[in-house]
């Protein structure tokens, strides 16, 4: 009997790797949850033509995304469209945080994709001290204060809305085209190059040299560095270090797809997703044997 929000496997990411893992989890009748965007992979969607996927020559990224979505629907796999802001290794299980909710899983598969937006100076150093990746988690700390919000995806504008409803002033820099507008939101035309402050974030410096004083900085990214998401995760050249079975240095945690490094290929991602899922099942079986 499972508790509410308790799963065998949590899969983070709805690119080809995460979808591959989810499909195989459904086939193996595991209790799992799939986190990600209902629009699946923006990277795949933008691909004009994919010519190296076996048996599907010259398929567009848009069509491939549509076929992946249809496969999920056919298998009654539901996407939980919540952004995971933290994964915590509790020893024999993992706790995942998404907004105000908690999810428990015995194993985790990271299919978060390659980090497309590089961290800026001070971002990691001041994380938790004025820098946040989660609007709903930390927004209430900035009621009637001045904040900066840096976003790389339109889907996060609901979170921008949430923050604008709390803060006195919001400096907003979207790295994409948008007509988002709100009375207390000022659009920045120059990107931030650093978060300033010693013990706590107190401002940002822009590429044009301007300095803006703020009380906090929110980065609303499609994906954050995996070792920020899960502390203690071993990295190699900016990617998650994995063995051939897609296991990481943390027991029960597996990774697949672009987040494990080059080559960034759809066929590779799908194969790794399959491997990660079967390795997770092997891990769960061993875990169950120890308990019994």
List the model feature ranges, each with a label.
Residues 1-12, 79-144, 217-218, 241-244, ...:
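FAD-binding core/adjacent interface of flavoenzyme oxidoreductases
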Residues 2, 7-33, 96-98, 187-196, ...:
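Structured catalytic cores of enzymes that bind and process phosphorylated ligands/cofactors
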Residues 7-63, 67-71, 145-179:
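Beta1-alpha1 glycine-rich phosphate/pyrophosphate-binding loop at the start
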Residues 13, 111-113, 150, 218-221, ...:
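Short, well-ordered coil/turn residues at beta-beta hairpins
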Residues 21, 44, 89, 119-121, ...:
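Short glycine-/acidic-enriched loop or helix-start segments at secondary-structure transitions
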Residues 25, 46, 120-124, 140-142, ...:
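Short loop/helix-cap segments at secondary-structure boundaries that form the rim of catalytic
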Residues 72-90, 95-97, 103, 165-244, ...:
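A Rossmann-like FAD-binding core segment of flavoenzymes
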Residues 119, 125-141, 220-268, 272-282:
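FAD-site-proximal beta/loop scaffold in flavoenzymes
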């Amino acid at each position: 009997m499972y508790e509410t929000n308790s799963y065998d496997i949590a899969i983070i990411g709805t690119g080809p790797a995460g979808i591959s893992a989810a499909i195989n989890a459904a086939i193996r009748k595991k209790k799992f949850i799939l986190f990600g965007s209902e629009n699946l992979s923006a990277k795949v969607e933008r691909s004009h033509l994919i010519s190296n996927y076996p048996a599907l020559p010259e398929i567009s990224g848009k069509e491939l995304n549509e076929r992946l979505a249809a496969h999920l629907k056919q298998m009654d796999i539901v996407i939980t469209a919540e952004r995971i802001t933290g994964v915590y290794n509790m020893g024999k299980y993992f706790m995942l945080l998404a907004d105000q909710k908690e999810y428990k899983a015995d194993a985790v598969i990271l299919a978060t994709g390659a980090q497309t937006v590089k961290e800026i100076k001070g971002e990691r150093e001041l994380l938790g001290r004025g820098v946040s990746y989660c609007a709903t988690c930390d927004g209430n700390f900035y009621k009637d204060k001045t904040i900066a919000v840096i976003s790389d995806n339109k889907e996060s504008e609901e979170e921008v809305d949430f923050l604008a409803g709390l803060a006195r002033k919001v400096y907003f820099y979207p790295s994409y085209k948008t007509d988002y507008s709100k009375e207390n939101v000022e659009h920045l035309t120059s990107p931030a190059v650093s978060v300033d402050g010693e013990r706590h974030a107190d401002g940002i410096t822009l590429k044009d040299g301007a300095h803006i004083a703020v009380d906090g900085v929110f980065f609303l990214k499609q994906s954050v560095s995996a070792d920020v998401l899960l502390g203690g995760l071993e990295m190699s050249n900016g990617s998650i270090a994995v063995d051939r079975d897609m296991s990481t240095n943390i027991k029960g945690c597996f990774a697949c797809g672009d987040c494990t490094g080059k080559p960034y290929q759809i066929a590779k991602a799908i194969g790794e997703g399959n491997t990660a899922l079967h390795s997770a099942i092997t891990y769960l079986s061993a875990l169950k044997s120890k308990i019994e």
